[in-house]
């Protein structure tokens, strides 16, 4: 059978977690080789055991310690009292007779530091109590053992005293004890002040969303509670602000989150908006986020908040054997935070296949589908659940999956085709004639009306051209006044004359066409009027032109000519005005 | 003008038309982007969060809607507010906004775009202001052409008055209601211009949406009848008018009655009577016109006498019925808010609760300049432009601006209704002015370029009449104008669009201005526009973006954030029992229910004056009496807002007189005079003992003196009157970081000891509390 030749136990209670480190030297003094080793804890500790790892360390040198953890499972308690919990450790190789093995055991317990008194006022200090055994509880005989408890650097209210108990500074030592029977037990109680933040996340949901566009988005929802002694009575802000140290020592204001390096787009908010009290420091090694909840947390007070950050994909996603794997830490980045219920959801991109997860410790696994940005099939979500998580669980997990890069393009293509279809429908809708009945009177009337409008536009453009020719005529007159070249002027008149005639020829069929439509009955008189007016204007202009040219031929003075054409000029202006009015009227149709 | 000069018919004109259309669509899209993005200052400077008070309620309702669905929403009885009465939310809320946002959220989520309800709510207002500016374009286009439409849309996109109610996060009814208002008006004008029943039906639907969205729909249902009446009186009756009006009244009223909050009010209250009266009148007029058409003039005269006599009788009967109806209802059939519109002094006389809201006060002159800025100067020009020529549509906008100016003068909140009218008017004014000036410039430049060598012409820019005929439309001149227009930004880029161009030409002929004058005037107009833009951006960024639940102050060592409200709401929501009741003044009711999820006694929906008065009475009573009132209401926590430490002026001490007034209005033992020293409201050593012993005073200043030793109140700028006192019936449970919110818990009643119980009894029977106990229905 086994004998523990030497046991050293160190309990660290400087934070809210009691972290126990044990060095066990196991000797097989029996005749058969042994391949299993039993670890026992008192039940009240065993129930609160959050983390347990056992590693063999060969030799005494510190550097030689191997990091291979041995597999640990909860063993059934055959013939043992209920007040003991047992874990069995599979040894790396069977321990044959007379062999020695050194085991390093790390165990973390939550909720073992009981606040006492359970309710304190704002001004009182926060005292907690630790119960342990001065002697190592073991199914094996122990030859030599010692216990040291590292207390926070503060007041120590009381502790159980035995003859070989020593208090050195903030370190309390029990032992050494020699040659004790198996299952020897001597309870001790340490009552001391704790300044640590008793921050407990009742529930933490971490969503890790992988985007192959280059980002891993982490969103963490915390329900945090202060699990220390509850606050009783008033909370006075005055006292808290004026004398924060005695009057608020039991509260914590800050939490420090140590995020991976190159974390970006960090936010800190709760369900009613952004929380502005946070501070970030970052360098190439790490990103430190100091967050302050909306209010200082006293014992029993709760709060809720969300932290989110993006991480570069290249730091976390790797490829191996045709598969990709995400290598990311499991627990919360907040230091010294105990999580009662941790749910990690790894959201993989749409179209991932063959998903498998490896974790360094047992977790509950399941899979879900999440629909996010324009998903059709949905994204596979790996859900990992674990209760009672301590910072020691902050180890990397690996999620393996297969993903083809073509899937990346599906959503942009979908968007593009969506817009494409939208525009195409718009084009078709505006171009196509989608009236139901092609023979209904309203449809025919509409067609007719379209024709009328087209004709009107033609008429308009011809009249405009006429007007433009008129302008040319006027221009030629001005040239005349400058150069005195009568011949060119006459030529201009001739050309415009013929041009105008052509135009009026063009107008005629249009007019007839317009009159043939019943729906244009209220327009055609106006159009006719326009044409008549235009004709008149033509004549007037010609007359004026002739007069001016004649005047120049007769070499009469400019003033004289002007006097002669003055009346004509007025009429021209009036006519022109009328034509423009008519044009405007037609235009408004 | 381009279209008119095109040498070939057909293609170039069509091309230019298309170009103009594409350009105006592009400009409209840009206006939409502008309207959306100018409202994002609050998100950029602060955060994406719901603002102020009412938006929190709407947000909460939207959350409920998105979680539980529409049927649950209609039947929702909210037990988190007005404890112990509760409130039937489905039947007392204008559902337009929540349904809109809920639908958007649902649509996005069914497309798998996972936006939170909060995000949708925050951005609903900016999105709808883009819609509103497009609706303004449509409306103004119907009135004065697309040029004016674009100008008006651009102005509306950034008018500060509208920004103040529609920045991102300001999730209030007005955000969608202004869009609905303008769109309803547009459809009315469109129906009036086309006489199409299709648009008339759409108009009724738009009106329905407006009724769903905002109580301000009564503005529509009174303005449109007034316009119809105006048209009839000025002899502008036409079948189009009938089509525009009659379906609206019938369909609109039926649809409005479908909205639970309106229900039978749509036919019963006086706000709607004008529409029915005009409905009768328009039928009479239609009949008269019809008879006039089928009868000879002689017969018609006979008929007129007949009809008039019968009509008089009918009218008399109807009027008698109306009068009887109006007289039978207690407030004369008018709601308090409507009455205070008709008689601005009504609220302050009779309903202190309406008067106590700052947005129900009349505005000051500077607020006009602040809210509509240069538009105030452009509006008269726009009105003049509307009169030349006066059409049905332009007479409508004139009526609209006149009415809205009156209403905005009564209540500062209705400045919002004025803003679109002012934008439309200013858009018309600007567009006409630009037409005139650019027309003149073009004409002048055309003239000079045409005769650059002509010595005579260079000197004579003023002999306009002669050049008039010959000048103008050479290609060169046009090119110059086009170049300029492209430089001068979008307001003039629409110039190539052919429609207003002809008008411009007419104008040009009528009013040709000298080149220098028009250039200077143009520059001045552009400067005016620039000032407007600068002011709007400033207003959006500085004045109207603060969410009011987060305050910031700029000090020497950087930006300081005061997030006290959310700090204490978060505390309440996480550290009190879910069914605890929190009493506070009604301003904070909506926020407490939405952010802290705790039951409140009164909230911002001030429907029960007595209940509010009870809380007001408690706040103004001494501690013991207040404790009894609160205890009778199951209150566990009392929340007060206190700004004395950091100088936050809108705290409860400054609102205290309203609590006294409202409380005193129902419980007469609270007298305003008891709280005033010689008519002055003060909290220093001169204050009255009633004041110094009131619960509000004590809860605000509890242990305040210990902060600086003197108790100097930074808001009132004085030392407080009573410095050292203890609370016997309340205990402080939470005070926020800057002391802005203080939460107190009611101490449990003490066990009765024989002697003490007697003593207590004698005290209460003599003190104020017994009175309040009698009056207070909850005791």
Swiss-Prot record, chain B:
The chain crosses the membrane at residues 18-38, 125-143, 146-163, 175-194, 197-211, 217-233, 239-264, 273-292, 306-326, 365-387, 394-410, 415-436, 519-539. Glycans are attached at residues 597, 604, 608. Mn(2+) binds at residues 54, 172, 174. A motif (DXD motif 1) lies at residues 52-54. This is Dolichyl-diphosphooligosaccharide--protein glycosyltransferase subunit STT3A. A motif (SVSE motif) lies at residues 356-359. A motif (DK motif) lies at residues 652-659. Keywords: Endoplasmic reticulum, Glycoprotein, Glycosyltransferase, Magnesium, Manganese, Membrane, Metal-binding, Transferase, Transmembrane, Transmembrane helix.
